[in-house]
Swiss-Prot record:
It comes from Photobacterium profundum (strain SS9). Keywords: Cell cycle, Cell division, Periplasm, Signal. This is Tol-Pal system protein TolB. GO terms for cellular component: periplasmic space. Part of the Tol-Pal system, which plays a role in outer membrane invagination during cell division and is important for maintaining outer membrane integrity. One of its GO terms (biological process) is protein import. HAMAP family: TolB. InterPro entries: 6-blade_b-propeller_TolB-like, PD40, Tol-Pal_TolB, TolB_N. It holds the Pfam family TolB_N. The lineage of its organism: Bacteria, Pseudomonadati, Pseudomonadota, Gammaproteobacteria, Vibrionales. Coiled coil: none annotated. Belongs to the TolB family. The Tol-Pal system is composed of five core proteins: the inner membrane proteins TolA, TolQ and TolR, the periplasmic protein TolB and the outer membrane protein Pal. They form a network linking the inner and outer membranes and the peptidoglycan layer. It comes from the Bacteria. It is found in: Periplasm.
Length: 449
């Protein structure tokens, strides 16, 4: 199933401005019942009115969406302490909760917010009654081994939600040993048939908040891809009656034309160091993979022959590419070594496999797999060859992996409209990101901020 490319003409370039339409909002569909219980205590606000951002709610939502944690509802909490000294450890362990996040927010004289928060090991706190004894310089002293995190920060009002995501990352890493991906962004294309500019390239926080309109066009926009530093997006637009590849600086609002060869220009993908761009051209006939050096402008052809080769994705070490090819009759995923152009087929299970991406550690291949059940997101262990179908949604496409490798965002069809969905890399947790003002396609998960 190769991508179908449509013709376009006019494009309008916008500043990186916020849009007023309904934002994406995650809806949990599966996976929470088996997750680890955790207490995210409502942060105490020692100020007038309401806190502009409900920090504890953001943290709870982040951890819930990871699929690994199940925050306790506030109504079921035995208490709501704002520091570890106030915790009733027995009450929490009786609920099966082994970790708590507590916090307090105040406002300083400059009008900024002072956020104090703690991550507490409840089990260890119960065993030591909140205090343990250890040796320091040969003397017995009280320690706080149960206090896993104890941080303080001064935050501007406009940064409160961002800092809440940062807290989520800290908590997630402390409890799992893996880096969190909550302070990240996604890019995607929205198709709003009721708009004068129906094709829109947007960027948002991973959870759909702080959505920004980057670009709008009367003609199709496709295949957004992030630069490694998160400052640029490569994408395909249809100007001058053909597909063209551009790179846009999302902060400056400037863009550069990268390729405009006859016929097809598509599937741009930055190299891990950001110095090159893998792309697909058909200037010699069939679709072929090329690499363009963004500094020297040198173009190197990687694949050749009569078959169509497309959807290139870089190996994390930058030494090879995976790509989709129909050289065997149906689309399957291959790997090409850039040193000698040797090629190996990777996928064998399913009549078709396409849209492949690699997890950051290079261990797993995530792709669209076609079987008797349709087109679904699947994961293949590149060491063992084992394949796991991750989704049960309809007509899945365009998977994109979180920078920590823990989640996959993709496009699917629900109620006859394209929308974005999330699935954990183990397939146990699923969520949907519905939108009310258009079809959402071609998601791309950005790098760590």
């Amino acid at each position: 199933m190769m991508k179908r490319w449509m013709m376009g003409l006019c494009i309008a370039l916008l500043s990186f401005s916020q849009i007023a339409q309904a934002e994406l909002e995650l809806v949990i569909t599966e996976g929470i019942d088996s997750a680890r219980p955790i207490g995210i205590i409502p942060f105490t606000w020692e100020g007038e009115g309401k806190l502009p951002t409900d920090i504890s709610s953001v943290i709870a939502s982040d951890l819930q969406r990871s699929g690994k944690f199940s925050p306790i509802a506030t109504s079921k909490m035995p208490q709501t302490p704002d520091s570890e000294e106030q915790i009733d450890y027995r009450a929490w362990t009786a609920m099966g909760v082994d970790a708590l996040v507590t916090g307090k927010v105040t406002k300083n004289a400059e009008g900024n917010y002072v956020v104090n928060y703690q991550l507490v090991d409840v089990v260890r706190g119960q065993l030591t009654s909140g205090e343990s004894r250890g040796l320091a310089n040969g003397e017995l002293v009280l320690t706080k081994d149960h206090l896993l995190v104890n941080n303080r920060a001064i935050v501007k009002e406009t940064r409160l939600r961002q800092y809440a995501h940062r807290i989520s990352d800290v908590v997630y890493e402390a409890l799992t040993g893996e880096q969190g991906a909550f302070l990240t962004r996604i890019a995607y294309v929205v198709i709003d048939d009721k708009s004068k500019h129906p094709y829109q390239l947007r960027v948002a926080d991973y959870d759909g908040f702080n959505e920004r309109l980057v670009l709008k066009s009367r003609q199709p926009l496709m295949s957004p891809a992030w630069s490694p530093d998160g400052s640029k997006l490569a994408y395909v637009s249809f100007e001058n009656q053909q597909a063209q590849i551009y790179i846009m600086d999302i902060y400056k609002g400037t863009r550069e034309l990268v390729t405009s060869y006859p016929r097809h220009n598509g599937s741009p993908r930055f190299s891990p160091d950001g110095k090159k761009l893998a792309l697909v051209l058909s200037k010699t006939g069939s679709l072929q993979i090329y690499i363009k050096d963004l500094k020297t402008k040198k173009l190197t052809q990687i694949t050749s022959g009569r078959a169509n080769n497309t959807e290139a994705f870089w190996d994390p070490d930058g030494k090879s590419l995976i790509f989709t090819s129909d050289r065997g009759g149906q689309p399957q995923i291959y790997r090409v070594n850039l040193a000698d152009n040797s090629t190996k087929r990777l996928t064998w299970q399913g009549s078709q496999n396409l849209g492949g991406q690699l997890t950051p550690d290079g261990r797993y291949l995530v792709m669209v797999n076609r079987s008797d059940t349709g087109f679904n997101i699947a994961k293949q262990d590149l060491k063992t060859g084992a394949v796991q179908i991750l989704t049960k949604t309809f007509l899945d496409e365009s998977p994109s992996i979180a920078p920590n490798g823990g989640m996959v965002i993709y496009s699917s069809v629900n109620n006859k409209s394209n929308e974005l969905s999330l699935v954990s890399i183990d397939g146990r947790f699923k969520a949907r990101l519905p939108t009310t003002n258009g079809r959402v396609r071609a998601p791309s998960w950005g790098p760590f901020l």
